């Protein structure tokens, strides 16, 4: 008897705080996912980093042996300055001197990466004025970009997602949930094909040092707004039509970001995902719901009474003959 009572009380406790338990498991799962990613990245990339460090030490030692007139301190000062300039997007290589980082097309590409919060980091402002303007420009531009993307995605979603699903549901009688799932999968497949696979194939041809995997990696890192900056198109030494290429990449990033948001919005509108998300949300209190219901009822009652009073006044204004006739009947006997 006591065991059954204890079990039922535990079940009621779990059901009462189900949202809190789900949220706790969500936080724990997210932290474990972070740790899992750190372990995998460290185990995969650390050996390659060690090999690269050993190779650089050998090259440095060989260079110093071949140039005995140069001290190690002088070489390190030179390399430090070169690396510092490289971090700002400036290269000392002779065949890279013709590529400017702040011509109009490069600045347009930089502005698009700032507003979309991609931020490759290969080109950064050098002057104090440029850094100050970048802060002000981002503070205004990022919310403006979010507003712009929200409006564009909302309009596209109506024509691309909601109307097709409603059409197949009404015209052919298919289940709305099934149609929504099939439509979301097809839309995701088309988006991945048009903005990942096809551009990756194009980049692998236009960029000399990129293979298909590296090109696909760039597309994903860019359209997911991660923007690591290890792969940036249009930075080749002998890049043809560089200005036109930069403008095309800017348009691709903007259209691809819109397409990604449309797909995400389409999946978020699925009934199953809505139910899944509600598991982690805080439920409204019953008292709060009752207050909202009472306020709604009061507003409805007051609006009804106001409408009734207005209708009575309109009837009085629209019936002048009735009023004059009744007054004549009252005054008539008195005059006689």
Curated annotation (Swiss-Prot):
Q: A single GO CC term, please?
A: potassium channel complex
Reported effect of changing residue 250 to L?
Slightly decreases the increased permeability to Na(+) ions at pH 6
- Keyword annotations: Cell membrane, Cell projection, Cytoplasmic vesicle, Disulfide bond, Endosome, Glycoprotein, Ion channel, Ion transport, Isopeptide bond, Membrane, Phosphoprotein, Potassium, Potassium channel, Potassium transport, Synapse, Transmembrane, Transmembrane helix, Transport, Ubl conjugation
* Bilayer topology annotation: Multi-pass membrane protein
What's the name of the protein?
Answer: Potassium channel subfamily K member 1
Posttranslational mods? Sumoylation is controversial. Sumoylated by UBE2I. Not sumoylated when expressed in xenopus oocytes or mammalian cells. Sumoylation inactivates the channel, but does not interfere with expression at the cell membrane. Sumoylation of a single subunit is sufficient to silence the dimeric channel. Sumoylation of KCNK1 is sufficient to silence heterodimeric channels formed by KCNK1 and KCNK3 or KCNK9. Desumoylated by SENP1; this activates the channel. Desumoylated by SENP1; this strongly increases halothane-mediated activation of heterodimeric channels formed with KCNK9.
Tell me which Gene Ontology terms the entry assigns under biological process: cellular response to acidic pH; chloride transmembrane transport; glutamate secretion; potassium ion transmembrane transport; potassium ion transport; regulation of resting membrane potential; response to nicotine; sodium ion transmembrane transport
Where is the segment annotated Important for intracellular retention in recycling endosomes? Answer: 293-299
Q: Which residues lie on this side of the membrane: Extracellular?
A: 42-103, 123-132, 203-211, 232-243
- What positions are marked as the site Part of a hydrophobic barrier that is stochastically dewetted and limits ion permeability? 146, 261
Region ranges (Selectivity filter 1): 117-122
Query: InterPro entries from the xrefs?
Result: 2pore_dom_K_chnl, 2pore_dom_K_chnl_TASK, 2pore_dom_K_chnl_TWIK, 2pore_dom_K_chnl_TWIK1, K_chnl_dom
| Protein function | Ion channel that contributes to passive transmembrane potassium transport and to the regulation of the resting membrane potential in brain astrocytes, but also in kidney and in other tissues. Forms dimeric channels through which potassium ions pass in accordance with their electrochemical gradient. The channel is selective for K(+) ions at physiological potassium concentrations and at neutral pH, but becomes permeable to Na(+) at subphysiological K(+) levels and upon acidification of the extracellular medium.
Q: What gene is this protein a product of?
A: KCNK1
């Amino acid at each position: 008897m006591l065991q059954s009572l204890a079990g039922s009380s535990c079940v009621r406790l779990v059901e009462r705080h189900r949202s809190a338990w789900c949220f706790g498991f969500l936080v724990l799962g997210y932290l474990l996912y972070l740790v899992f990613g750190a372990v995998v990245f460290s185990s995969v990339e650390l050996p390659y980093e060690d090999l690269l460090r050993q190779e650089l030490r050998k090259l440095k030692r060989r260079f110093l042996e071949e140039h005995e007139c140069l001290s190690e301190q002088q070489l390190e000062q030179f390399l430090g300055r070169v690396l510092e300039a490289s971090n700002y997007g400036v290269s000392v290589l002779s065949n890279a001197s013709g590529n400017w980082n702040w011509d109009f097309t490069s600045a347009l590409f930089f502005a698009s990466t700032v507003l979309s919060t991609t931020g490759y980091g290969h080109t950064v402002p050098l002057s104090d004025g440029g850094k100050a303007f970048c802060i002000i420009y981002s503070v205004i531009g990022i919310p403006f970009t979010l507003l712009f993307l929200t409006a564009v995605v909302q309009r596209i979603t109506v024509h691309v997602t909601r109307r097709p699903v409603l059409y197949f549901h009404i015209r052919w009688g298919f289940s709305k949930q099934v149609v929504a799932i099939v439509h979301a999968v097809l839309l995701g497949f088309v988006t991945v094909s048009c903005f990942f696979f096809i551009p990756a194939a194009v980049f692998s041809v236009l960029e000399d040092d990129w293979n298909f995997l590296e090109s696909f990696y760039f597309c994903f890192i860019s359209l997911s707004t991660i923007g690591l900056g290890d792969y940036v198109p249009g930075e080749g030494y002998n890049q043809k039509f560089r200005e036109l290429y930069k403008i095309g990449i800017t348009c691709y990033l903007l259209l691809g970001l819109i397409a990604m948001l449309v797909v995400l919005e389409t999946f978020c509108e699925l009934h199953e995902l809505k139910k899944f998300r509600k598991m982690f949300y805080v439920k409204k209190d019953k008292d709060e719901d009752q207050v909202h219901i009472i306020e709604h009822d009061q507003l409805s009652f007051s609006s009804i009474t106001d409408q009734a009073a207005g209708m009575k006044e309109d009837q009085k204004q629209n019936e002048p003959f009735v009023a004059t006739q009744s007054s004549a009947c009252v005054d008539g006997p008195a005059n006689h």
